[in-house]
Amino acid sequence: MSEKKSSSGEKLLYCSFCGKSQHEVKKLIAGPSVFICDECIDLCNDIIRDEASSVETLTGPRTDLPTPQELCELLDQYVIGQNSAKRILSVAVYNHYKRLKHLGKKDDVELAKSNILLVGPTGSGKTLLAQTLARTLDVPFVIADATTLTEAGYVGEDVENIIQKLLQNCNYEVERAQKGIVYIDEIDKISRKSDNPSITRDVSGEGVQQALLKLIEGTMASVPPQGGRKHPNQDFVQIDTTNIMFICGGAFDGLAKIISERSEKSGIGFSATVKSREERSASQVMLDTEPEDLIKFGLIPELVGRLPVVATLRELDEEALIQILLEPKNALIKQYSKLLQMEGAELEIRPAALQAIAKKAIARKTGARGLRSILEHALLDVMYELPNEQNVSKVVIDEGTITNGAKPLLIYHEQPKVSGAK
């Protein structure tokens, strides 16, 4: 019933859906023997909007696919340097999603996917590049750690757990998950101990590489529903990994030496050219990475063959680290400035301090990752004391704060003079 009489005899109208009276809502719209209030209309609009957006996302990645040049420009906003790696990634990702758009069309030429291997020192931006690409394309993304993976049947994570995490990240929408991006970090840590096949079982090294082969190439992976454990008599969610892009990354410490041994052949005799092994830095040597070097490092040939696109990232120099501190949209200096602004103070870091931070990060050999810990250490006391201080207008960090551990300089607001005070 949408109509009732009140105690005073007045006829009251009620919403047929939520039961609220005309006095409890702003608007009551009448239909044939039914009424609906403005609150229920808003709720219905929200439900329709949510369902429409989920249907749009099921169709896969963005329809307006950015060109490689546009992708590279978007990466420039978040990642400093590494121009060669950005170009390689942009072209590979563009071709991959262009291929997905043409999957339904009948053609004699079948386009195969090209997975990517990122080679570069720690803190050079491998993970950030993959994250930024996934965010730009609005596709499901997951980071997996290769060091936690083991062969099926052993204690540790199965390779199917990677797909399970990807599925969780898109609320178990299978169609979306099948067009996502998977970044497998620390791939170099599962290399076998030598380039010869092992006669003993290596469940966390070569065994994991073998397990990853079909997953990366394309297979139907069985994933437990809603993240449960695998057990018999259970229904599994079937995920086709053929159209999932896999990006593998690793530091490959020691690869430069293998490349040098291959490329810098020394002669014998008086007329032989003696080449200095210190002529090129490790980053420059790594640019000449060949599949045979990766196999000698410890990756199995089958896995190297499934990662045809190799992008090498250089070690970040002092200038690049200073740019990372200042220029990206989410630069560290901007982040800490925001934190201090919340306490009513401004952050100033002098040029000499920026250079000292960059030099310290290079000395630690942690790349861009070391910048945050250096800044955190320098600002720790200030962030501890500032909430109790009422009059600080600016926090200044100079070279001494970074190199000698001196306290940052605090500048206070001028106290207003009270007129008539004696």
Curated annotation (Swiss-Prot):
It holds the Pfam family ClpB_D2-small. Zn(2+) binds at C15, C18, C37, C40. GO terms for cellular component: HslUV protease complex. Keywords: ATP-binding, Chaperone, Metal-binding, Nucleotide-binding, Zinc. One of its GO terms (biological process) is cell division. One of its GO terms (molecular function) is ATP binding. ATP binds at P121, T122, G123, S124, G125, K126, T127, L128. ATP-dependent specificity component of the Clp protease. It directs the protease to specific substrates. Can perform chaperone functions in the absence of ClpP. Component of the ClpX-ClpP complex. Forms a hexameric ring that, in the presence of ATP, binds to fourteen ClpP subunits assembled into a disk-like structure with a central cavity, resembling the structure of eukaryotic proteasomes. This is ATP-dependent Clp protease ATP-binding subunit ClpX. The gene is clpX.
